[in-house]
């Protein structure tokens, strides 16, 4: 079956959990979390869960695993904590949970960021994607620009297709 055929069979609506990772954001100031919600809704997807967690490995893992265990969540989208500072532990937290890494997500995100957005600073991004069982997790930087780029160029065009692939036998 071709990629085109897979995409035709893919679900049009995917159920998502948004996790913002920040020591300072609130629901009122979480611009990237709000942007994720808007972009998903505009694309016909549903946000079934949203939370803000602190920049610590245990809190991040608990939030991601809570999404994994929910029947009304197909995808967990995290934003924040993907840089190289001491407090940036999202990648360490999420990668330890992944069964399979979607290596192309991070590679393409950095390439597009380099070419279309922030130039050589793209090398500082540690965005990651992968699967836990039949769920997919994408971890992207916390800036609204990075979220918009990741969602519009990579995640939204493939969200239904990825979900379809994870449920094939």
Curated annotation (Swiss-Prot):
Gene Ontology biological-process annotations: Mo-molybdopterin cofactor biosynthetic process
UniProt keyword Ligase present: no
Pathway as given in its UniProt record: Cofactor biosynthesis; molybdopterin biosynthesis
InterPro entries registered for this protein in UniProt: MoaB, MoaB/Mog-like_dom_sf, MoaB/Mog_dom, MoCF_biosynth_CS
Organism domain of life: Bacteria
Gene3D superfamilies in the cross-refs: MoaB/Mog-like domain (3.40.980.10)
Keywords of this entry: Molybdenum cofactor biosynthesis
Annotated GO CC locations: cytosol
The protein's role, per its UniProt record: May be involved in the biosynthesis of molybdopterin.
Annotated family: Belongs to the MoaB/Mog family.
PANTHER family per record: MOLYBDENUM COFACTOR BIOSYNTHESIS PROTEIN B (PTHR43232:SF2)
NCBIfam families with a match to the protein in the record: molyb_syn
Protein name: Molybdenum cofactor biosynthesis protein B
Record organism: Bacillus anthracis
Gene giving rise to this polypeptide: moaB
